[in-house]
């Protein structure tokens, strides 16, 4: 979900009642996608990894970014890449990693459209991560993903209840926001606001929503869960099986 930011940034993450449990929900920004503003058209989206010390005082409450290298386990990058690949396999989106220039959060930058880093979000039991909707949404904040540095992160996706959260699953959820999807009330959907390891990656409703925004993938087939190297906005603590996502 979107963290509570400056008023110029669109907020995300709260379930809006009543929501029907039958369809994806597109985010509130306009045009609400990358590339052409026309729904159903593809896009190339860049992404970059923010360095420790990057200023994010423009976020509600203020913060300083910690690089993923400094709080995630070795091998995390593969899970980030797999999360991007899970979306490009089902929708007409191409992702390209670029260098991050170190500019402050929401400032003018030549970094990726989606910038990824972490900061303290209050510790275990609260928000796991948050992701910002696409343009127009503040300055360069649109699309950015931030993880909670105080939670435990895992390369595995084994449902062991060890208190750690799947980097792949949470990243895929947050990328969904960064590309234009809101939370959905549809059960067993990646964009449902509760963390679960009952399934892997985008599900039918998530895929339908992303294809509505960007069109179907030009090449390739839907990935099988076994083909993904298994390892948001926020998850609210209800145990490992159910925690609210942003």
Positions of PLM-derived features:
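Bacterial N-terminal signal peptides that target proteins for export
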Residues: 1-9
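Short, charged juxtamembrane terminal tails flanking transmembrane helices
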Residues: 243-246
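Short alpha-helical segments used as structural interaction elements across diverse proteins
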Residues: 1, 173, 239-241
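Zinc-dependent metalloendopeptidases
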Residues: 19-223
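A ubiquitous, low-specificity "background" feature that marks scattered single residues
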Residues: 8-9, 212, 230
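A short, hydrophobic C-terminal helix/tail in secreted or cell-surface proteins
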Residues: 223-241
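Bacterial N-terminal signal peptides
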Residues: 9-18
């Amino acid at each position: 979900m979107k963290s509570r930011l400056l008023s110029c940034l669109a907020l995300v993450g709260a379930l809006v009642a009543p929501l029907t449990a039958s369809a994806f929900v597109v985010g509130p920004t306009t045009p609400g996608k990358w590339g052409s503003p026309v729904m159903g058209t593809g896009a190339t989206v860049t992404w970059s990894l923010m360095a420790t010390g990057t200023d994010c005082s423009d976020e509600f409450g203020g913060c300083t970014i910690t690089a993923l290298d400094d709080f995630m386990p070795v091998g995390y990058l593969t899970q980030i890449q797999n999360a991007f690949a899970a979306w490009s396999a089902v929708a007409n989106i191409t992702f390209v990693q670029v260098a991050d220039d170190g500019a402050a959060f929401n400032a003018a930058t030549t970094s990726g459209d989606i910038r990824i880093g972490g900061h303290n979000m209050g510790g275990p039991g609260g928000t796991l991560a948050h992701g910002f909707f696409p343009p127009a949404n503040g300055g360069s904040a649109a699309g950015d993903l931030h993880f909670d540095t105080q939670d435990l992160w895992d390369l595995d996706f084994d449902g062991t209840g060890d208190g750690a959260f799947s980097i792949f699953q949470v990243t895929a959820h947050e990328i969904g926001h960064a590309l234009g999807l809101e939370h959905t009330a549809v059960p067993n959907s990646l964009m449902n606001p509760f963390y679960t390891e009952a399934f892997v990656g985008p599900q039918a409703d998530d895929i339908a929503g992303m294809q509505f925004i960007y069109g179907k993938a030009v090449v390739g087939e839907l990935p099988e869960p076994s083909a993904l190297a298994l390892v948001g906005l926020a998850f609210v603590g209800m145990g490992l099986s159910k925690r609210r996502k942003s």
